[in-house]
Amino acid sequence: MQIRDNLAKDYADIYTPEVLAALAFMAGFNDEQQQLMAERIERRAARIRERRPIGFLDPNARIPGTDIRVQDARDGKFIGAEIPPDLQRQWIQGTGPAAKPDAPVRSSLRNVAYALLSGADGWMFDGEDALGQISAMSLDNQRSLKLAIGRDPLFLEVAGQVAGEMNTWSRGFLGREIVTDWRAQLGFTTTIFRCRGLHLDDRHIRVRGRSLSAAIVDLTLYVVNNHLALTAAGASIVLYLPKIQTAGEAGFWNRLLSALEGHLGLAEGTIKAYVLIEQLEATFQLMEIRAALGLHFVGFNTGRWDYINSVSDANCWDPAFINPNIESVLMTYGYMRHYEDRVRRAVNTPDAGGNFALWQGGMEPNIPVGSEAGVASSMDKARAGAEREQREGASGKWVAHWKMVHIIRPVWEQAGAANQLGRPFPPLGYTAADAADLTLLEPGPRTIRGARNLLSVALQYGNAFGQGLQAAALKAADFFGNDDILYLMEDMATGEIRLSILWEWLHKGATLTEDDPETGLKTGAVFTAALFARLLDEEYAKLLAADHRDVHEGSKTTTLPIARAIVEAYVTDPVKYPWYIDLLNLNLNNHDLDLARARITRYMDEFKTSGTRITENLDTAPGR
């Protein structure tokens, strides 16, 4: 096992002897992880070749890697977990990373202090879509969490300062203080960690010359470094598992968790896991995923952006499948409505022990920063969205900023129940009609305004990613300076879905549903390559001209041109690539546009030739 540069020494507090021993043990799963990802790409390629939609599993089949029959999983004939006390009430879970790009430890610890003093019932500290990956940010993230969970004196000093700052804001915005006894309040919020998905490689570690799975690294570093402190505090070890596409992949995660528990001498099922349902294929296998994770599984989360992206990508072969403006694809829209309904039915199907699971609702991306009118309008919409999810059966939801906790949490507080476990819903169906509902399109606008929004935010997000800001407050450039239009806190998913929809519109001959005075285009005009090129030039020019508060001045000659090159290549190529993040990852810490273009071409050529995604860190790859 090789750790690049001097990181083993610089992060000796993270790469401890115990961690290194566990990594060496867990690295035994690396080949299986790579095989699973090869199978994932082949399933996708076969569907595209055969123009075949995703379907339900054969009820008589076995879930790969397990001895569980599909029909038994659907019938609840498996042993699941009881929900531990500190997850029984999770009305609001905040989300965000525990590190900032190129920041001192004290600065990053402020992120953790804001989170743990926010009053959220849980906080998902992100190692995935919201965590920048420049330099050694994944290790900075782990360091912050270890210091905070262990209640290091430096963290406690920072937390005391942050408590006062939070009260200053809350007195002005809420008319009251939200932190009374800050030391006691640190123990209120359940600490949760999201690992990177199986589709990503770690940027720092190689085993026998091959990159080690980022999922294996994140899982091992977090659990080994923190399980003793969490257990001593009476807290659960809780993870979010992202981007799972199949029950077979869930079974692999289950084996990872069980193996690490065994290595550490922990009882089977000590580690608890939520699964983010952000992939269309997973929605066809919800009960199977529950069963495959067994004693580790506690609940599902319904995202929005990543899920829309997965539906778009899974139907890239179908010329009739064209999404409307992204703003129209709400949780009540066509396929999203049916997706949410299947999740709530799945968690409320009892297992063999009579246990139900949790449904954690989707993300609220609004931030209460802007004009008085803009904030009031956005907060009304945010509360209405939370009220809808609570009515539909969610036991809680996510917020993207600590300030939103006290705006959204009262929705569940007023409802009163700790959770909605066991709320009765009709049983899941597995008919052709049920399958069709999961890709149901409904009429919606498809406009130049919508295209500009897609492009502007996709470019800005790619730029932010290159700067190490995978969680970024964004809005389309046309609304810069308009405080009535609020910024939304976005992560990698926002870039993925925007490029997928632009690719759909361009390569499937999407037509506009409204006249556009600025371009002179009429209803029925086709979204052509020439139109895309024009909009790309115009939206890029707006970002170059933007104030440094919206687009960092230094990025305009470094990471922004690379973001443009990636967006242009991804959207215009007739081949639909599975991940925007792949092309961004290949260019982390790179500001050379020519090198970026060469890497983009190399990735695309490799994918077209062999179906292989280049996911390793090219800066440290053998032979480069």
Where are these regions (language model features)?
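Subunit-assembly interface segments of extracellular/virion macromolecular structures
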Residues: 32, 36, 40-50
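Conserved alpha/beta-domain cores
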Residues: 1-29, 36, 52, 57-78, ...
